Amino acid sequence: MVSLHPLLDNGITPGSDSFPGGTLKCLCPSFPVEITLTTNVAHNHACGCSKCWKPAGALFSIVGVVPRDELSVTANGDKLAIVDESAVIQRYACKECGTHLYRRIEKEHPFYGLDFVHAELSEEEGWQEPQFAAFVSSVIEQGFDPAKIGEVRARFRELGLETYDSLSPPLMDAIAAWTGRKNGKYDLHSWLDCERRKGGGGGGQPGGVVCRL
């Protein structure tokens, strides 16, 4: 059986709609960088792109988003550095262990206002479980045997996750709507018109944030 990620290989553990957030730490054995999230992640998913941080041996990363004002660096932030300052999505990584703590967008972008994080770096339980798999075919570009990509998609389906070679349809629709609004095609709320949710809810967005068109 193909190995995807430690959080997926033994089955998916459901998260909690009422989970309030927690702390994420880098992998340094002493003085780790720590960030604190005051809400659960949303749109958590497996990602096959070459940019996302993955634990050793993992084929996919697991990444979700939180509003940027729900994230703060709470310990040893002096160890953080931006991996590529020219990139639209700036990745803040520990200079010692290389772990990516969060990604932030400072330029005009459909997802401006959201930070990307890896909830697996937390010891708390209750984070939203993965909802889908994105950029699946991208692992081929990184050296994965194309003859075995069908096994990868089949394994995701066994786990109950739909596979895409881009982001999920709701997120792709959001990008298209943002672009249409930017081009003056219609007057539309930004997809990042995010509201705090009082209590939990379904739809893949539990624990605090609602993003809508």
From Swiss-Prot:
Pfam families named in the record: GFA
State where Zn(2+) 2 binds: C47, C49, C52
Write down the Gene3D superfamilies for this protein, in alphabetical order. glutathione-dependent formaldehyde- activating enzyme (gfa)
According to UniProt, this protein's pathway is: One-carbon metabolism; formaldehyde degradation; formate from formaldehyde (glutathione route): step 1/3
Q: State the top-level EC class.
A: lyase
Q: Which EC number applies?
A: 4.4.1.22
How many cofactors are bound and how? Binds 2 Zn(2+) ions per subunit.
| GO molecular function terms attached to this record | S-(hydroxymethyl)glutathione synthase activity; zinc ion binding
Q: Which cofactors are required for activity?
A: Zn(2+)
Q: Which reaction does it catalyse?
A: S-(hydroxymethyl)glutathione = glutathione + formaldehyde
Is the Lyase keyword given for this protein?
A: yes
Q: Keywords for this entry?
A: Lyase, Metal-binding, Zinc
Q: Does the keyword Lyase apply?
A: yes
| Residues annotated as domain CENP-V/GFA | 19-165
Which amino acid positions bind Zn(2+) 1, per UniProt?
C26, C28, C94, C97
A GO biological process held by the record? formaldehyde catabolic process
Family affiliation: Belongs to the Gfa family.
Question: Its function?
Answer: Catalyzes the condensation of formaldehyde and glutathione to S-hydroxymethylglutathione.
Q: Which PANTHER family match?
A: CENP-V_GFA DOMAIN-CONTAINING PROTEIN-RELATED, GFA DOMAIN-CONTAINING PROTEIN
Q: What NCBIfam families does this protein map onto?
A: formald_GSH, PRK05417.1
Q: What is this protein called?
A: Putative glutathione-dependent formaldehyde-activating enzyme
Organism of derivation: Podospora anserina (strain S / ATCC MYA-4624 / DSM 980 / FGSC 10383) (Pleurage anserina)
